[in-house]
């Protein structure tokens, strides 16, 4: 049977009242999208690709506020974001391009205040951030399981470090200008326990549609 091909720039589905309920078309940059509308014409769901090819799904409520987004970037990173009734994103979950997961919780003003991530080698890190979005405290485990707590100032500089060395020796250091000014155990070295590169960025990536 011969196939029939219909070509157009856009398609619209309407209800019995003539209201558009679904639209398939191209955005101004020729990116394809599919949008679903409620009886009042508000977009409740939209799926599409941006100019780079990244895919995104956005779901809105009856007030037109986006409440959930799901996206996949061209570098392989993905993200899920959940918003409140004011359209402010309050929780984000994402995977960096190399697969490191990150969970971020945000204040109602939109600033990220809590980040939990797992590095590529499996080390977990908990980050607490201030109203400017800067990390002020980090608690994590190194690859071999040694715990590390870092306290940072408003500029993001390390000031206090507490942890256990590989052999279980407790360590406490006061730091200024990245140099220890006082240490309770200066003969041992605390293992690194920083978030994986790009892990926090992944959770902040908004799906494009």
Task: List each language-model region with its residue ranges.
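Parallel beta-helix/beta-solenoid repeats that form elongated, surface-exposed shafts/blades used
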Residues: 1-194
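Long, low-complexity, intrinsically disordered segments
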Residues: 196-209
């Amino acid at each position: 049977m011969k196939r029939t091909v219909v070509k157009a720039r856009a398609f619209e589905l309407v209800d019995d009242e003539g209201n558009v309920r679904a639209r398939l078309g191209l955005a101004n940059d020729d990116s394809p999208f599919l949008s679903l509308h409620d009886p009042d014409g508000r977009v409740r769901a939209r799926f599409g690709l941006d100019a780079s090819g990244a895919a995104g799904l956005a779901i809105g409520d009856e007030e037109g506020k986006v409440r959930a987004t799901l996206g996949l970037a061209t570098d392989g990173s993905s993200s899920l974001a959940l918003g409140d009734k004011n359209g402010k994103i309050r929780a984000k979950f994402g995977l960096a391009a190399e697969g490191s997961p990150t969970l971020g919780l945000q204040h109602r003003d939109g600033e990220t205040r809590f980040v939990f991530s797992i590095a590529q080698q499996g080390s977990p890190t908990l980050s607490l951030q201030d109203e400017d979005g800067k990390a002020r405290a980090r608690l994590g485990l190194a690859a071999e399981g040694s715990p590390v707590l870092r306290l940072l100032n408003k500029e993001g500089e390390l000031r206090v470090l507490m942890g256990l060395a590989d052999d279980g020796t407790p360590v406490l250091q006061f730091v200024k200008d990245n140099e220890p000014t006082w240490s309770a155990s200066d003969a041992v070295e605390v293992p690194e326990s920083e978030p994986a590169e790009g892990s926090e960025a992944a959770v902040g990536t908004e799906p494009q549609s």
